[in-house]
Amino acid sequence: SEVLVTAERQKFERSMESSQIALDLREINSAPAFVEPDIFRTLQMLPGVQTTSDFSSALYVRGSTPDQNLIMLDGIAVYNPYHLGGIFSTFNTDVIKEADFHAGGFPARYGGRMGAILNVINREGNTTKTTGMANISLISSKALIEGPLPKWRGMKGSWMISGRRTYFDTVIDALKIPLGQN
C-alpha cells in the first residue's frame, strides 16, 4: 500500500496594482478643460481625487496633500509640476504619449509616498518629416516643432522642441498691480 501525494505550486502575482489607471492623449484632450486641456484637470475627475478650488490643479488623492504625491516625467521626479501659480500643470499635452496614475496600492519602489504616483510619458518625435503646431488661448500660447535626425549607421531618431508662455506677467504689468513691491 503506497500513498501518492501530488500538488501544484501556487502562482504568486507580483503585480497587483488595483488602482492603476492609464490615460492616453486622446482621453486627456477629450476631457472637459479649463481654457486648454491639462492632465491634472483630467485626473481631478477620477474617483478619490479632489481639488481645493477651480483655480488649483493640485491633486488631493484619498485625503493626502499634494506634497505626498510623486509626479514623474519619463520616470524622473518633477518637484514643481505646477504652472501659472498652480492653475495648470507644467506638462504640455501636445507631447504626452500616455500617463500612468496610481491612486494607492502602488509598488514599494515608489516608497515614502502616501498619496499617488503619476508618471507622464512623452511621445517620440516625428521620424519622417519636420512638422510643427501652435496654439493660442486666452491665457497662454504654446508651440511645438519636431522632425527626424539624420540617419546614422542605419538608426533612426527624432528631435522635438515644445514651449508654453502665459500672459500673466503682461496682464499684471498692464493693470499696474503691485506684486511683492513695497
Task: Say what each PLM segment does.
Residues T52-S56, S158, N182:
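Short, surface-exposed acidic
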Residues E2-P107, I117-G125, S140:
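Periplasmic N-terminal accessory/gating domains of Gram-negative outer-membrane beta-barrel systems
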Residues L70, E98-P107, G115-R123, T130-G180:
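Predominantly transmembrane beta-strands of Gram-negative outer membrane beta-barrel pores used
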Residues N80-P81, Y110-G111, G154:
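Alpha-helix N-cap/helix-start motif
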